């Protein structure tokens, strides 16, 4: 692992280099031989006796040793040619960056602007612009081919077992196929059941898909605040998050230099970037929600569309008639965006401008193919408030808005709670599918209990695994700092790894055809005492090695046939291996001693056959004794003499 930056600049240093015993490889789709779809290959030890394991990779070129990273130049703009090739877009000058875009920060506190400037694109006319419009028109885009190839990692090896894996899982109505084709991707997008968040101005993007019939995805939140962090830290957090498996990243910056921070992140991000535009709009009016206007908000949307933001959280479901429903809650309105709009509605005693101008928002977002992430501004902030009328009233409105956005050609996913105890989670998934026409669900956890500040990555990981199993398409991570402070680099990693576990557990439970490949490979390595393979097949090899080395630090311990838990004498796997090895070395004489001449095993009967024969004898004996559960002891003794 290396920390690289351009030696001629003080701009962000980011983590590069491959993960332990891994290498970047590329898959070429048959439908588009010009595409290179990245994946990570975990290289197993020579004695493994099995092939290396390919896994889904979110890390972009940062883990490719053949690529020189220069954050000042940004990543290659590969998608630009795809977008222009399709047509229906125009290049234009774009809006001028204004002082308020960065919070009117003074020169002494202004962050260095990203130097490379690219003119933005926007859609023109009625030609398809969004992935949804292309899908409905029967057109398979390069993005669709790309994500189909990514989703199929491991499925080719598992084709023979795919049906069995699907049958073994419980998908709760999801239609996970044995193999993902570009046509299947197109159909899912056309039906609104999946989205490819991919702004036409985010040319650096490696496309991915969000939907319940695909791998469960996770999102990591980053962003500065008025009191802490910088551009350098946030770019590094983004790269760090995707290194460990974040499929998307949301920039939730609320402090200075919001525009500049976002530009640096976007130009260096291979994953979709989401934002909550109301945060920046609020900064433009000195943090006073009452001063917000539709015109100011719309200008902020244009600004972020031109930069390349892939999805917007918009709290258009927080309506004036619903606010009073939160009055009796234990924790009221906990969403920042929701509370901002609630205050605006009450101050002006008007319906939310996000709701009244929703069709205009759709028209604007369509021009750039920015996806909606319809925000749950009235989500419960405590388990006491879970599944109340305020939460579900907003969800019903989000269903109404979903239909409007779809009619306008926009891609949509729906945000969900929050704080929900385990027994109330499934109704959230079921109601979302019903109200929102199976649009992808994207939830924050949910946290299943409120008693563990400092451990809410665990309280939420439990709920995330459950709702992912029930059909949630993307899980928003929670870090140990939830409710306590702004997460640092270590917290980001902990949150991402926790949610990778939850997402993978959900894929297993749904019966994803290739999900168990990695589990089985690691289990075999564990049984064979291939310690290095165990470490490297895990989600976090570095932590696994560190924990092992705390008690067994010598290199010789990494080939030992025991661990510190049981020691050499009591290791169950070692004992099992010894028994197997002993059985394999037995000669004919020893086997004859174990299975005397005339015994059923010696005659060739299988152990199962011997057991079944014995059970039959005992059944007959039960009948002979009169068929009674309890009998006299003397009678049993006499019966045994006969046998």
UniProtKB/Swiss-Prot annotation:
Pathway: Cofactor biosynthesis; thiamine diphosphate biosynthesis. Its EC number is 4.1.99.17. It catalyses: 5-amino-1-(5-phospho-beta-D-ribosyl)imidazole + S-adenosyl-L-methionine = 4-amino-2-methyl-5-(phosphooxymethyl)pyrimidine + CO + 5'-deoxyadenosine + formate + L-methionine + 3 H(+). Its cofactor is [4Fe-4S] cluster. It comes from the Bacteria. GO terms for molecular function: 4 iron, 4 sulfur cluster binding; carbon-carbon lyase activity; zinc ion binding. GO terms for cellular component: cytosol. Substrate binds at residues 221, 250, 279, 315, 335-337, 376-379, 415, 442. GO terms for biological process: thiamine biosynthetic process; thiamine diphosphate biosynthetic process. Keywords: 4Fe-4S, Iron, Iron-sulfur, Lyase, Metal-binding, S-adenosyl-L-methionine, Thiamine biosynthesis, Zinc. It holds the Pfam family ThiC-associated. Binds 1 [4Fe-4S] cluster per subunit. The cluster is coordinated with 3 cysteines and an exchangeable S-adenosyl-L-methionine. Disulfide bonds: none annotated. Zn(2+) binds at residues 419, 483. Signal peptide: none annotated. [4Fe-4S] cluster binds at residues 563, 566, 571. InterPro entries: ThiC, ThiC-associated_dom, ThiC/Bza_core_dom, ThiC/BzaA/B. NCBIfam families: PRK09284.1, PRK13352.1, thiC. Homodimer. Catalyzes the synthesis of the hydroxymethylpyrimidine phosphate (HMP-P) moiety of thiamine from aminoimidazole ribotide (AIR) in a radical S-adenosyl-L-methionine (SAM)-dependent reaction. PANTHER family: PHOSPHOMETHYLPYRIMIDINE SYNTHASE, CHLOROPLASTIC, THIAMINE BIOSYNTHESIS PROTEIN THIC. Belongs to the ThiC family. This is Phosphomethylpyrimidine synthase. It comes from Nitrobacter hamburgensis (strain DSM 10229 / NCIMB 13809 / X14). The gene is thiC.
């Amino acid at each position: 692992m290396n920390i690289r930056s351009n030696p001629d600049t003080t701009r962000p240093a980011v983590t590069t280099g491959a993960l332990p015993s891994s290498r970047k490889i590329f898959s070429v789709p048959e439908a588009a031989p010009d595409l290179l779809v990245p994946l990570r290959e975990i290289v197993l030890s020579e004695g493994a006796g099995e092939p290396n394991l390919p896994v889904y990779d979110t890390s972009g070129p940062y883990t490719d040793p053949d690529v020189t990273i220069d954050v000042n130049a940004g990543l290659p703009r590969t998608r630009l040619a795809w977008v222009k090739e399709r047509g229906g877009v125009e290049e234009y000058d774009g809006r001028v960056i204004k002082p308020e875009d960065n919070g009117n920060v003074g020169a002494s506190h202004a962050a260095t602007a990203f130097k490379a400037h690219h003119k933005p694109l926007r859609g023109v006319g009625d030609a398809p612009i969004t992935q949804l419009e292309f899908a409905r028109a029967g057109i398979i885009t390069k993005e669709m081919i790309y994500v189909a190839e990514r989703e199929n990692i491991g499925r080719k090896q598992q084709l023979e077992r795919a049906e069995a894996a699907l049958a073994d899982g419980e998908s709760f109505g999801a239609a996970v196929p044995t193999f993902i084709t570009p046509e299947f991707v197109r159909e899912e997008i056309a039906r609104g059941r999946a989205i490819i968040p991919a702004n036409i101005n985010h040319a650096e993007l490696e496309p991915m898909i969000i939907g319940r019939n695909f791998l469960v995805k996770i999102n990591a939140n980053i962003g500065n605040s008025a009191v802490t962090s910088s551009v350098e830290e946030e770019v590094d957090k983004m790269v760090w998050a995707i290194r460990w498996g974040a499929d998307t990243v949301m920039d939730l910056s609320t402090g200075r230099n919001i525009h500049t921070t976002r530009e640096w992140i976007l130009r260096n991000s291979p994953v979709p970037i989401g934002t909550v535009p109301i945060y920046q709009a609020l900064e433009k009016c000195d943090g006073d929600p009452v001063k917000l206007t539709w015109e100011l908000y719309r200008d902020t949307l244009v600004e972020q569309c031109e930069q390349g933001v892939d999805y917007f959280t918009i709290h258009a479901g927080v309506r004036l008639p619903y606010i009073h429903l939160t009055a009796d809650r234990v924790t009221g309105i906990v969403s920042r965006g929701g509370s901002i709009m609630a205050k605006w509605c009450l101050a002006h005693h008007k319906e939310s401008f996000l709701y009244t101008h929703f069709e205009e928002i759709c028209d604007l977002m369509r021009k750039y193919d920015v996806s909606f992430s319809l925000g749950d501004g009235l989500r419960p902030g405590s388990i006491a408030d879970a599944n109340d009328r305020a939460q579900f009233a907003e969800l019903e409105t989000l269903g109404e808005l979903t239909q409007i956005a779809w009619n306008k050609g926009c891609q949509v996913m729906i945000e969900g709670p929050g704080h929900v105890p385990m027994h109330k989670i499934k109704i959230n998934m079921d109601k979302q599918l019903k109200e929102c026409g199976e649009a992808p669900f994207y939830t924050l956890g949910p946290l299943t209990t409120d008693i563990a500040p400092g451990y809410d990555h665990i309280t939420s990981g439990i709920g995330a695994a459950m709702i992912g199993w029930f059909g949630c398409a993307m899980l928003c991570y929670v870090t140990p700092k939830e409710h306590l402070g702004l997460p640092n680099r270590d917290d980001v990693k902990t949150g991402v790894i926790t949610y990778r576990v939850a997402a993978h557990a959900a894929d297993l439970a749904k019966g994803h055809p290739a999900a168990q490949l990695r589990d089985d490979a690691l289990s075999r390595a564990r049984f064979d005492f291939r310690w290095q393979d165990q470490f490297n097949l895990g989600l976090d090899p570095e932590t696994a090695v560190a924990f092992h080395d705390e008690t067994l630090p010598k290199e010789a311990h990494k080939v030992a046939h025991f661990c510190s838990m049981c020691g050499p004498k009591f290791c169950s796997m070692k004992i099992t291996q010894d028994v197997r090895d002993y059985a394999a070395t037995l000669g004919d004489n020893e086997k004859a001693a174990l299975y005397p001449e005339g015994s059923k095993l010696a005659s060739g009967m299988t152990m199962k056959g011997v057991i079944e024969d014995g059970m039959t004898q005992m059944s007959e004996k039960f009948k002979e004794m009169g068929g009674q559960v309890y009998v006299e002891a003397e009678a049993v003794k006499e019966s045994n003499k006969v046998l």
